[in-house]
Each structure stands twice: as C-alpha cells, then as structure tokens.
Amino acid sequence: MTDIHNHKILILDFGSQYTQLIARRVREVGVFCEIFPHDVAADFIKNYQAKGIILSGGPESVYDSDVKAPEIVFELGVPVLGICYGMQTMVMQHGGEVKGADQSEFGKAIINILNSTNNIFSNMEHEQLVWMSHSDKVTQTGEHFEIIASSTNAPVAAVAHKNKPFFGVQFHPETTHTENGKQIIENFVVNICGCDTLWNIENIIENDIKEIKQKVGTDKVILGLSGGVDSSVVAAILHQAIGDQLTCIFVDTGLLRLNEGDQVMQVFAEHMDINVIRINAKNRFLDALRGICDPEQKRKIIGKLFVDIFDEEAAKIENAKWLAQGTIYSDVIESAGNNQSKAHVIKSHHNVGGLPKEMKLKLLEPLRELFKDEVRKLGLGLGLPYNMLYRHPFPGPGLGVRILGEIKKEYVETLQKADAIFTEELYKHNLYHDVSQAFGVFLPVKSVGVVGDQRRYEYVIALRAVVSIDFMTATWANLPYDFLSLVSNRIVNEVKQVSRVVYDVTGKPPGTIEWE
C-alpha cells in the first residue's frame, strides 16, 4: 500500500489568516502537509522528516517582534519557502533588513519576474498578477539572497538564496487572487522539494480503511449520525472498513429540515445497508424547550439533551469499544490555536457529545487529517450523493435557532414547509450553489394579509441567503427580484400559517449569518 505520508511538507504558522489556505493548496497539488505553531520544538522539526518547510505570513512586524523562524529550519538542508512575514524573517535572519513600508499594500499587484531559472517561477510568464497584503518590506536582502521578482511598490517581491534552496515571496500565492499561485506552490513542492504526488482520494480511502481495520480489529464502534457532511462521510468510510461492527445512532430532534430524518434513513439504512438506530425524540426536545426564549439557553438545552439521549442509547450497545466522531483538520487546528497560535481564533471546536464520562470508549476520528473540501471529495469517492455532500451548512441546534423565541410544534412545522419551498426553488433555478447558505427564519409575530376577500392575521417568514468564502464575513445574496417574488407567493399560498415574507439584506458584520 502507498504511504501517503511519506513525502510531506511542514508549515510553520506565524498567525496569518491565510495559513490554512497554504495547506489546502499544497494538498491540491497532491502532497500531504501539516500546520504547526512557529515555536514548535526544534527536535520536533528535526524528527518530522519534512521534504520541505513553508513559513507562513503573520500580523507582526519582524523588526518589532522576537518571533523568528527556528534556526533548525535553515540547518536541515531541506528547501524553505517564506511567505510575506515568513520571507521577511528568513531574510532578516540571514543578515538582511526589513522596515515599515511608506504605504501599506493590500490588493492585487503586478510583479515582474527577473529570474525564473530552476526556482519557484519556473515555466511562468515574466508578468504575474499577485495578491499583496503587507505593511513592511525587505529593504536590504543581505549577501546571501538575490531578488528574483519585483513590483512598483515592492522592489523586493521575491528572493532566492544564492547557494541554498531557500525562497521567499512578499505576496500570497495561496490566495485565489494570485493568478498562478498554485503553479508557484507546485514548483516549490514538486520540483524543488521533490515530493511525489501521493495525496489523492483513492490513496486516502485505501489508507484510511487499512488504518481503521488495524486500530479497531473486531471491536464494535458507535457513531452519532446527524445527516451532516462529516458524520455521513465517517459512516461511509467505517462501513466500508468494518461493516456490521458499526452502529450509528441517529437522534431525531424534530428540529431538522423537512423530511430530513427520512432522507438520512433512506441513504444509510436502506441504500448503504448500514446499521442505524433512529431515536424519535421530538417530544422530549419540545418539552424541554417549552417556555424557553433565550437563544443561548436553547442551545444549551438542545446540546445537553442530545448528549443525554445519545448516551442512553450508546449504553445499550454491548461490547462497544470505540466512539467515532467527525472531527476534521480545521477543528484540530482551531483547538490547537486556543493554546498556541497567534491567529485570532473566532470560535473553539466542540464535537457534539464528546466522550461520555461513564463510558470507557476510545475515540476514533477517521477524518482528522482532512479539510472540509477533502471530506466532500472523500464522500463522493465512497458513493455518497452529491446533494448530501454539498448542502449548505446547518447549525447543530437545527431549527431551534431559526425560530426566534420559544419553540412550538406548529412553529417548527411552519418553518419546515417555508424553508423547503425556498430550497426547492433555489435548486430549480440553479441558484443553490451560487449562494453559500440559504434558509428561512420563523418570526413569532403576526402580520395582517389579504387572501381573496378574506383578511389573514398570520406569521412572518424571513428569507436569508448569503455569499461567503469562510463564513467569518458574508454579504447578502443579490437574488433576482422575480425569483424572490415567486418564492414569496408560493410560501404565502401554500403555507397557511404565513401571511408575509421578508428578505434579509444584512451583511456579516454587522449581522451574524444565523438570526440567533
């Protein structure tokens, strides 16, 4: 079997918002890589056996900070690529000079390649469109580095060491705004570091199945199945690896999208023949949420009850030794970031449930090394439906945070119907994948309306659709007026409890994507 980790790149994180993008670009080329804090122990770097090292960008100024690349990086004899701050600290640590730029540079720029012989610019045109994001600049390269690219505002746009395979760029090749950024990454990783492109979905599936079999043996495994992307892919890979040793527990909270519980059972229990226990807990959740209006309280109640029900059912499964979870690589990085990274962590990751205290279960995380886009590709490779893998994100508490205030059965049913109409029309008009997230929100206020000659006094539904790259920021989706009119008419005519539909035109910031 191919060792997909045999050729790997080590990325040292100096706190850039783009660090995960670097890793994703390296993996897109077909090479495994991992991200670690810049101050990780020298022995760790030495023993990691990387084929090459990438130094990320960062928010600090090199001349004001004691944050440097570990000297071991430059002593191992492996190729090094410094990006933005990474280039600046590398040059400075080799006798160069970095100063604050007269003017910060953020945005697109044209660089001129001065030397493309056997370096990161091999086989590229002399003019390149790149993405700059810096306030400092290299003013002196020192005796060891030469300039291999420049721009109007950044005379030192890229450098190469005269004797060693060390390269630096002032711009960000990892962003999509840098036109041929992937080529630069590929030149470094494949041509300069000499990595074989072993990281692909076929090899990952083969490797994961072998690892799961070796780890689990004949033990039984429990998985909390939600119907979301991560748990669905975990279910599929575990089923291929260990078959009937896997039992999935699907807690139907009653707060899912219309018919979602049935769809989950159809895909996994019927089509894939996976052992799924469906727990109808709708009434328990409604009872627990009665009279509760505060969003945080609702989240806590839903989360705790979910765990309690999962624990009850898991305890009934005899000889279970493992609890599988859908932890992915960005979760791992975020969790590490709370303790180690200089990047601003927006939220920490908490897998629903975690390890129940009274259960002596070992944790199994088959997706731990994969980014979300890789998880989706893995799911396709395992035969899961495209529409399941590329659905819009859905919050853990479900419709519980899309119904403002108290949650009642009639509110849930009303929102499910309205939301389903919105989603159906997005698909029909080929708009679903043009937006990053789209959903309905139930407002517990009544508004007067007229149908025929009759006055109606019913509830309001807000439609929300946003476009976002990372969900940290978002713009409201500029959906066609004719489309919104059609959706509104359908909802008011087909959902009797609704008399008015509004469209949310708030970005993030100042708003959040979800209403609660």
Curated annotation (Swiss-Prot):
Family matches, as SUPFAM superfamilies: Adenine nucleotide alpha hydrolases-like, Class I glutamine amidotransferase-like, GMP synthetase C-terminal dimerisation domain
Active site annotation, chain numbering: 84 (nucleophile), 172, 174
Positions of the Glutamine amidotransferase type-1 domain: 8-198
Name of the top EC class for this enzyme: ligase
Molecular-function GO terms, alphabetical: ATP binding; GMP synthase activity
Pathway membership: Purine metabolism; GMP biosynthesis; GMP from XMP (L-Gln route): step 1/1
Xref: InterPro entries: Class_I_gatase-like, GATASE, GMP_synth_C, GMP_synth_GATase, GMP_synthase, GMPS_ATP_PPase_dom, NAD/GMP_synthase, Rossmann-like_a/b/a_fold
Keyword Zinc assigned: no
Cellular component GO terms, alphabetical: cytosol
Enzyme Commission (EC) number: 6.3.5.2
Residues in GMPS ATP-PPase domain copies: 199-391
Pfam families according to UniProt: GATase, GMP_synt_C, NAD_synthase
Keywords: ATP-binding, Glutamine amidotransferase, GMP biosynthesis, Ligase, Nucleotide-binding, Purine biosynthesis
HAMAP family in UniProt: GMP_synthase
PANTHER family per record: GMP SYNTHASE [GLUTAMINE-HYDROLYZING], GMP SYNTHASE-RELATED
Biological role: Catalyzes the synthesis of GMP from XMP.
Subunit structure, as described in the record: Homodimer.
Protein name (record): GMP synthase [glutamine-hydrolyzing]
